[in-house]
């Protein structure tokens, strides 16, 4: 088990910022293998204003984005860029997405991603998001990494 990664360290691994950062903390990972992260869902999320008034539900596409961000963190931890460069991970594909549980304010989404394959700049991972022990969503995700100057 590795040390947890807080939001300040996450900001060094992802380009996302408010209101689109969807990973609050990494609680465990093993490079080139798996990562477990947390997203604390609060009523202050900007998407709850319109999804849905009086019945706030986290959009499924944002659960998938949270998994994609967890995948990008694992890929960033697993591969070092050249000096003065960083990797930007593009969401390149998704298969087998399934939604099993509604996510509402006050829930803590546990994001679990596992590396399924990596070839050059392409990363295939399987992700599952849980609320407690209940599966909220799952998907197979593909990302493409591009090395850019800082």
Swiss-Prot record:
The keyword Lipid biosynthesis applies. Its main location: cytoplasm. It is found in: Cytoplasm. It comes from the Bacteria. GO terms for biological process: fatty acid biosynthetic process; lipid A biosynthetic process. It is an enzyme of class 4 (lyase). GO terms for cellular component: cytoplasm; membrane. The active site is at residue 51. It catalyses: a (3R)-hydroxyacyl-[ACP] = a (2E)-enoyl-[ACP] + H2O. Keywords: Cytoplasm, Lipid A biosynthesis, Lipid biosynthesis, Lipid metabolism, Lyase. InterPro entries: FabA_FabZ (IPR013114), FabZ (IPR010084), HotDog_dom_sf (IPR029069). Gene3D superfamilies: Hotdog Thioesterase. GO terms for molecular function: (3R)-hydroxyacyl-[acyl-carrier-protein] dehydratase activity. Involved in unsaturated fatty acids biosynthesis. Catalyzes the dehydration of short chain beta-hydroxyacyl-ACPs and long chain saturated and unsaturated beta-hydroxyacyl-ACPs. PANTHER family: 3-HYDROXYACYL-[ACYL-CARRIER-PROTEIN] DEHYDRATASE. Belongs to the thioester dehydratase family. FabZ subfamily. This is 3-hydroxyacyl-[acyl-carrier-protein] dehydratase FabZ. It comes from Legionella pneumophila subsp. pneumophila (strain Philadelphia 1 / ATCC 33152 / DSM 7513). The lineage of its organism: Bacteria, Pseudomonadati, Pseudomonadota, Gammaproteobacteria, Legionellales. The gene is fabZ.
